[in-house]
């Protein structure tokens, strides 16, 4: 009898670390993207929580009128926010060591830049980690592609828009009321409701909700009975079972008769691709719209476009929206400038007799 002894090479510490990082057997997959994702998202989350609770007021407009955003300075969950970095800083990279003191850094809104830049890097790494895990499991890469839509939207409002406007102070505040303020000011300055890419985004989000509800209700209504009346229908499914849990033919027949035949998918794969692609493409377009409006390529302007035979303006909904935009623009940053840009651009009449 012959015994064969294998000599096992001792794995280095670095090799063991690499194997652990890339192992799909871990309870939570780390991955090389995760090595960067974990510290960046932890940093963004930690600073956000601390600043939301205790950050002092920030001179957002750069005019020595600080705006309070934290809970300890009089706000609640609804009104609180991380106030964007001061207009006095503009687009400058503003880490703590660039300020003369921590107090100055806080006064100029340094935490906003820190949170946003770490957050954007972190969510990109999360997207890369989705692709990495899919690759290692032999899956197709579409999960990461779908996640690129919210990543693009976050990038548009937190990075591209400030770059186009010339200051991080124009970025979206990190809070509920701050988000609404950002939306109102964006409409006032860029007429986003009249931009076709925003319209596509609305169709994507609301259409995606509708299709999700339609699909879920159709599947739930055409489950194959596996239980009695006294049991939950959910008990009729076992994780990993090979047979279908619902009758797609019945669902197809129902919906085809409810609308018309070709409104109903007869292929489960193309149906689920459609459910993923519709909202993703819509949000891509909205992100692209924000990114173009960042550089002042704004929504359609149909103001005073309808006149009668005497040249008198016949007001349309476009004119109503324009009046609302002017009102919103007058009210925001009211101490930073006396007139909205649209009014300030008009040449003043001569007062010389």
From Swiss-Prot:
MF annotations from Gene Ontology: chlorophyll binding; electron transporter, transferring electrons within the cyclic electron transport pathway of photosynthesis activity; iron ion binding; oxidoreductase activity, acting on diphenols and related substances as donors, oxygen as acceptor; oxygen evolving activity
Binding site for a quinone: 215, 264-265
Localization, UniProt: Plastid, Chloroplast thylakoid membrane
Post-translational modification: Tyr-161 forms a radical intermediate that is referred to as redox-active TyrZ, YZ or Y-Z. C-terminally processed by CTPA; processing is essential to allow assembly of the oxygen-evolving complex and thus photosynthetic growth.
InterPro entries cross-referenced by the UniProt entry: D1/D2 (IPR055266), Photo_II_D1/D2_sf (IPR036854), Photo_RC_L/M (IPR000484), Photo_RC_L/M_CS (IPR055265), PSII_D1 (IPR005867)
The family this protein is said to belong to: Belongs to the reaction center PufL/M/PsbA/D family.
Function: Photosystem II (PSII) is a light-driven water:plastoquinone oxidoreductase that uses light energy to abstract electrons from H(2)O, generating O(2) and a proton gradient subsequently used for ATP formation. It consists of a core antenna complex that captures photons, and an electron transfer chain that converts photonic excitation into a charge separation. The D1/D2 (PsbA/PsbD) reaction center heterodimer binds P680, the primary electron donor of PSII as well as several subsequent electron acceptors.
Note: 2 of the reaction center chlorophylls (ChlD1 and ChlD2) are entirely coordinated by water. Herbicides such as atrazine, BNT, diuron or ioxynil bind in the Q(B) binding site and block subsequent electron transfer.
Name of the protein in question: Photosystem II protein D1
């Amino acid at each position: 009898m012959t015994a064969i002894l294998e000599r096992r090479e001792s794995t280095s510490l670095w090799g063991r670390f690499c194997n652990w990082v890339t192992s799909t057997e871990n309870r939570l997959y780390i991955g090389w993207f995760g090595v960067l994702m974990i510290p960046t998202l932890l940093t963004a989350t930690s600073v956000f929580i601390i600043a939301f609770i205790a950050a002092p007021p920030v001179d957002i407009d750069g005019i020595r009128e600080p705006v309070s955003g934290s809970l300890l300075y009089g706000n609640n969950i609804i009104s609180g926010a991380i106030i964007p970095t001061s207009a006095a800083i503009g687009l400058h990279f503003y880490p703590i060591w660039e300020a003369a003191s921590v107090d100055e850094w806080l006064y100029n809104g340094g935490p906003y830049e820190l949170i946003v830049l770490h957050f954007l890097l972190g969510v990109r790494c999360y997207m890369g980690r989705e692709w990495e895990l899919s690759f290692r499991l032999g899956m197709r890469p579409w999960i990461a592609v779908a996640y690129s839509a919210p990543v693009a939207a976050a990038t548009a409002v937190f990075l591209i828009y400030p770059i186009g406007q010339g200051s991080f102070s124009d970025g979206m505040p990190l809070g509920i009321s701050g988000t609404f303020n950002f939306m109102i000011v964006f409409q006032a300055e860029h007429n986003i409701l009249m931009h076709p890419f925003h319209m596509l985004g609305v169709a994507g989000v609301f259409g995606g909700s509708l299709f999700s509800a339609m699909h879920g209700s159709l599947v739930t209504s055409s489950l194959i009975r596996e239980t009695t009346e006294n049991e939950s229908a959910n008990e009729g499914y076992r994780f990993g079972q090979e047979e279908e849990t619902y009758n797609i033919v019945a669902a197809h027949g129902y919906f085809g008769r409810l609308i018309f035949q070709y409104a109903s998918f007869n292929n489960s794969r193309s149906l689920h691709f459609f459910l993923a692609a519709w909202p993703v493409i819509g949000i891509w377009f909205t992100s692209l719209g924000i990114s173009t409006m960042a550089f002042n390529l704004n929504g359609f302007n149909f103001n005073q476009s309808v006149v009668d035979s005497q040249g008198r303006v016949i007001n349309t909904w476009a004119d109503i929206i324009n009046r609302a935009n002017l009102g919103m623009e007058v009210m925001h940053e009211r101490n930073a400038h006396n007139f909205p840009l649209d009014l300030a651009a008009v040449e003043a009449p001569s007062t010389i007799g």
